[in-house]
A protein has these predicted regions:
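N-terminal basic/disordered segments at the start of proteins
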Residues: 24-40, 47-51
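N-terminal beta-loop-helix "entrance" segment that forms/cooperates
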Residues: 48-69, 181-186
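Short, polar loop motifs at secondary-structure junctions
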Residues: 49-56, 116-121, 155-157, 173-179
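Glycine/small-residue-rich loop that forms an oxyanion/phosphate-binding "nest" at active or ligand-binding sites
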Residues: 86-133
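Anionic-ligand binding region
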Residues: 152-188
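A C-terminal functional module that forms or caps the active site or interfaces directly
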Residues: 182, 186-206, 211, 216-232, ...
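C-terminal functional extensions of proteins
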Residues: 216-218, 225-228, 236, 240-268
Length: 268
């Protein structure tokens, strides 16, 4: 009996601590890769939250949930109820509301927060970017210029271009817009990246595109349209990213894993 008690005491002293509970705010390729890496690491349990921006999101490793939390207050309640140790914000660079809610909820609950955000694209020689601060400014630019426009900003902001009467739009999005498209002249193209240079160049030429509207999402999956625009000397209305909330941030999955290793080194 005493030997068993001693063995149990030793096991209790050396057993692994409880896994770190991670709430991963997903929606990007980096978030999917990070979920897979964390799910394979016994030090962590991960649940990915998908806001529902796309109807058929790609599968993620580990647990997942869909839909919002009900703003900052709802997310704060969830963090407390689920005993979340850290929130990792792996959302799109333009998901400003989600990121702001996460920052405020983490502040309220004293929950650790890390942002994983790929670097933006940088303008290079040959690029003809028309930098704008937001979607309304992009729409105003298109309204002034007119022409045949390749609109690649996702389905949620299309309505901002409804006043562009002198433009024809090739609208590309993963899913059909939930509401009626209010622009007068358009063609809808449903497609999910990654896209390659040859196909993007052919798409622009075939449709006689003379202006592209894009968010500065960064990353390789949709960069081919920027390369194609450069090759064809086409102007790109480039929408700058919103300013993110203050806090710890890293540019890649590997950097996130290194940050987590350092942050929780003493725990394990």
């Amino acid at each position: 009996m005493s030997w068993c008690l001693t063995a149990m005491a030793i096991w209790s002293a050396v057993r692994m601590p409880n896994p770190i509970k991670v709430l991963l705010l997903g929606g990007t390729s980096e978030a999917r890769m990070l979920a897979a890496r964390l799910n394979a690491d016994e030090r962590f349990t991960v649940e990915t939250s998908l806001a529902g921006a796309t109807e058929k999101p790609l599968p993620v490793a580990g647990g997942s949930r869909r839909g919002g939390f009900g703003g900052t207050a709802g997310l704060a309640d969830y963090l407390r109820a689920a005993s979340v140790d850290i929130v990792i914000d792996g959302t799109h660079a333009f998901a400003a509301t989600i990121s702001r809610n996460a920052a405020e909820a983490c502040d309220q609950t004293k929950t650790e927060r890390l942002v994983v955000q790929r670097p933006p694209w940088e303008k290079t020689e040959g690029d003809r970017w028309l930098d704008v601060s937001d979607v309304p400014e992009a729409a105003a630019t298109v309204s002034q210029r007119g022409g045949r426009v390749f609109l690649t900003i996702g389905r949620q902001d299309i309505a901002a271009f409804s006043g562009c009467r002198d433009a024809w739009f090739l609208i590309r999005s993963i899913d059909r817009p939930k509401q009626m498209i209010e622009v007068e002249n358009y063609q809808l193209l449903q497609a999910r990246g990654p896209f390659d240079f040859a196909a993007e160049k052919a798409l622009l030429e075939t449709n006689g595109i003379d202006l592209i509207v894009s968010k500065n999402s960064g990353g390789p999956d949709t960069y081919a349209k920027i390369e194609a625009a450069r090759a064809l000397a086409l102007p790109v209305v480039m929408i700058r990213r919103p300013t993110p909330p203050d806090g710890s941030a890293v540019p890649s999955v590997d950097a996130a894993l290194a940050w987590l290793d350092e942050r929780y080194a003493e725990v394990f």
